[in-house]
Amino acid sequence: LTCLNCPEMFCGKFQICRNGEKICFKKLHQRRPLSRYIRGCADTCPVGYPKEMIECCSTDKCNR
């Protein structure tokens, strides 16, 4: 699996996930519209705090 891993809105950098990591995720804090994204690989979908938006997917570079 290959996931994007840069904080900018339009991301071109990616990483190859390690064995066992089968989820790509994207996290953004909703109260801070200009905040940076957190993207990467995970073994399960991360749990977010209140006001965090988390999207998880399982295909290559799907965490745009």
Curated annotation (Swiss-Prot):
Expressed by the venom gland. It is found in: Secreted. GO terms for molecular function: toxin activity. It comes from the Eukaryota. The keyword Secreted applies. GO terms for cellular component: extracellular region. PROSITE patterns: SNAKE_TOXIN (PS00272). Disulfide bonds join C3-C24, C6-C11, C17-C41, C45-C56, C57-C62. Gene3D superfamilies: CD59 (2.10.60.10). Keywords: Disulfide bond, Secreted, Toxin. Its main location: secreted. SUPFAM superfamilies: Snake toxin-like. Transmembrane segments: none annotated. InterPro entries: Snake_3FTx (IPR003571), Snake_toxin-like_sf (IPR045860), Snake_toxin_con_site (IPR018354), Toxin_cobra-type (IPR054131). Belongs to the three-finger toxin family. Ancestral subfamily. Orphan group II sub-subfamily. Binds with low affinity to muscular (alpha-1-beta-1-delta-epsilon/CHRNA1-CHRNB1-CHRND-CHRNE) and very low affinity to neuronal (alpha-7/CHRNA7) nicotinic acetylcholine receptor (nAChR). This is Weak toxin CM-9a. It comes from Naja kaouthia.
